[in-house]
């Protein structure tokens, strides 16, 4: 065991040194103690059209027994593009089990960006969008948030080996329409982050959902042994919507569940009303399927306590 640990440490050191030599300043150390690194990758070194940031954490048992944990950050990387690229990276890992994989990942991402630049797909700044920027919205991912996200993933582990895990049942909520925009929630029980990917893949098989302007999601998984949660969210281009939806789920104490809200933009900006509709869709489907009973019971208990205190 000790020999394997030493081998992993040495191979990680050698890999990081090689990547630093190859990519120079593009390769950045976020937290050396936590083994968190990032690199900005573009389709061209001269006038890049497509750029994204790959952030990784190297677990103690990488590369011998587990993959790097990773996060892809780019405002334009959404929906099917994100899933396609993630699937490519994970398939590449499975084809090279036990090997150092970061260089291959970086070059695969670069190849993906070059292919996008050579298609008729316009650059990210030219794409039509329904994004409505609010003052105070924070689109950047802080180092603390990134570290916490990675640690959460490490607590539960990423399941690359189980290809037989069943896709949880997905239910669909009622639609809400306002000024030609339509919103609809989709809900599924989840007990692992791996199931989140399965659910997204399944939803994107539906062409209507796949072509939604935004598919915002949030999930919370309760880890009883640690009395803690694995939780995350995705705006999918609708700035801050994912965080707001996750906050709602925290208030409702929703556990072991994922909610995706699809928005089909109708050409008229809704302003703050869009957040109200997104959260109402999420709240309605959570209540309909009894994922906020704990909060309701707690509220009733609090109400009873207040009445009792008033009588005294």
Curated annotation (Swiss-Prot):
This is Protein IMPACT. The keyword Cytoplasm applies. GO terms for cellular component: cytoplasm. It comes from the Eukaryota. Ubiquitous both in embryo and adult. It comes from Xenopus laevis. In contrast to the mouse or rabbit ortholog, the IMPACT locus is not imprinted in Xenopus. It is found in: Cytoplasm. The keyword Cytoplasm applies. Keywords: Cytoplasm, Differentiation, Neurogenesis, Repressor, Stress response, Translation regulation. Belongs to the IMPACT family. Residues 14-116 form the RWD domain. Translational regulator that ensures constant high levels of translation upon a variety of stress conditions, such as amino acid starvation, UV-C irradiation, proteasome inhibitor treatment and glucose deprivation. Plays a role as a negative regulator of the EIF2AK4/GCN2 kinase activity; impairs GCN1-mediated EIF2AK4/GCN2 activation, and hence EIF2AK4/GCN2-mediated eIF-2-alpha phosphorylation and subsequent down-regulation of protein synthesis. Plays a role in differentiation of neuronal cells by stimulating neurite outgrowth. Disulfide bonds: none annotated. Interacts with GCN1; prevents the interaction of GCN1 with EIF2AK4/GCN2 and inhibits EIF2AK4/GCN2 kinase activity. Interaction with RPL39; this interaction occurs in a GCN1-independent manner. Associates with ribosomes; this interaction occurs in a GCN1-independent manner. Associates with actin; this interaction occurs in a GCN1-independent manner. One of its GO terms (molecular function) is protein sequestering activity. Residues 118-128 have a biased composition (Polar residues). GO terms for biological process: cellular response to amino acid starvation; GCN2-mediated signaling; intracellular signal transduction; negative regulation of transcription by RNA polymerase II; neuron projection extension; positive regulation of neuron differentiation; regulation of cytoplasmic translational initiation in response to stress; regulation of translational initiation. CDD domains: RWD_IMPACT. It holds the Pfam family UPF0029. Residues 118-138 are annotated as: Disordered.
């Amino acid at each position: 065991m000790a020999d394997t640990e030493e081998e992993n440490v040495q191979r990680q050191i050698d890999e990081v040194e090689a990547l630093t030599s190859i990519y120079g300043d593009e390769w950045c150390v976020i937290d050396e103690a936590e083994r968190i690194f990032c690199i900005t990758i573009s389709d061209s070194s001269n006038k890049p059209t497509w750029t994204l940031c790959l952030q990784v954490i190297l677990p103690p048992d990488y590369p011998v027994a587990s993959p790097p944990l990773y996060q892809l950050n780019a405002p334009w990387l959404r929906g099917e593009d994100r899933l396609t690229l993630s699937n490519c990276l994970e398939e590449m890992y499975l084809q090279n089990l036990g090997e150092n994989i970061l260089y291959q990942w970086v070059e695969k991402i670069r190849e993906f960006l070059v292919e996008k630049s050579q298609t008729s797909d316009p650059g990210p700044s030219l794409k039509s969008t329904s994004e409505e920027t609010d003052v105070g919205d924070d689109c950047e991912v802080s180092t603390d948030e990134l570290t916490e996200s990675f640690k959460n993933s490490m607590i539960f582990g990423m399941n690359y080996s189980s290809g037989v895990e069943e896709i949880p049942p997905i239910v669909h909520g009622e639609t809400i329409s306002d000024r030609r925009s339509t919103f609809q929630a989709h809900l599924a029980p989840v007990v692992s982050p791996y199931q989140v990917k399965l659910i997204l893949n399944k939803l994107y098989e539906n062409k209507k959902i796949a072509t939604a302007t935004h598919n915002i999601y949030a999930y919370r998984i309760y880890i009883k042994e640690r009395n803690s949660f694995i939780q995350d969210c995705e705006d999918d281009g609708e700035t801050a919507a994912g965080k707001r939806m996750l906050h709602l789920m925290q208030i409702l104490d929703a556990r072991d569940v994922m909610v995706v809200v699809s928005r089909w933009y109708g050409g008229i900006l809704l302003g703050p009303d869009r957040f109200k509709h997104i959260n109402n869709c999420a709240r309605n489907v959570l209540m309909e399927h009894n994922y906020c009973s704990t909060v309701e019971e707690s509220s009733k208990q609090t109400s009873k306590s207040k009445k009792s205190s008033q009588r005294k």
